[in-house]
């Protein structure tokens, strides 16, 4: 197979994966955190960290549930170490919640259960 066709196939495959929902859009290209005018949850972790992997399906579900009401953002700090410094990260995963004005209002370190995340998002008015 000639190279140009191979590259076209690879690009098409990548776009199909991104468009399929396997990688939520806010994770594929993370917006500026916090997202202006929205309750924002940023989860700082790594794709290879075990508790982070346990949280991934929870965050994917909540990203769909709260779409348009809250921004759910994942940042892999092993791939982007400057982000760890920016957020004064001590452990992964860490979840940081921002109100609609962009003020950090809550920080949790370690695995966070879905019901606990929902409670914070709802308290901030994302429901």
For the regions a language model picked out, list residue spans one by one:
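A short beta-strand-turn-helix
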Residues: 26-39, 81
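Non-catalytic, surface beta->alpha helical segment in thiol-disulfide oxidoreductase systems
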Residues: 99-127
């Amino acid at each position: 197979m000639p190279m140009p066709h191979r590259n076209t196939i690879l690009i098409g495959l990548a776009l199909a994966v991104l468009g399929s929902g396997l990688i939520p859009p806010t994770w594929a290209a993370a917006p500026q955190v916090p997202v202006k005018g929205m309750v924002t949850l940023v989860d700082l972790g790594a794709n290879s960290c075990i508790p982070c992997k346990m949280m991934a399906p929870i965050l994917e579900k909540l990203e769909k549930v709260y779409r348009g009401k809250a921004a759910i953002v994942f940042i892999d700090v092993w791939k982007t170490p400057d982000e760890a410094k920016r957020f004064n990260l001590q452990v992964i995963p860490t979840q940081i919640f921002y109100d609609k004005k962009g003020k950090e209002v809550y920080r949790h370190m370690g695995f966070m259960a879905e019901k606990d995340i929902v409670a914070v998002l709802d308290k901030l008015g994302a429901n």
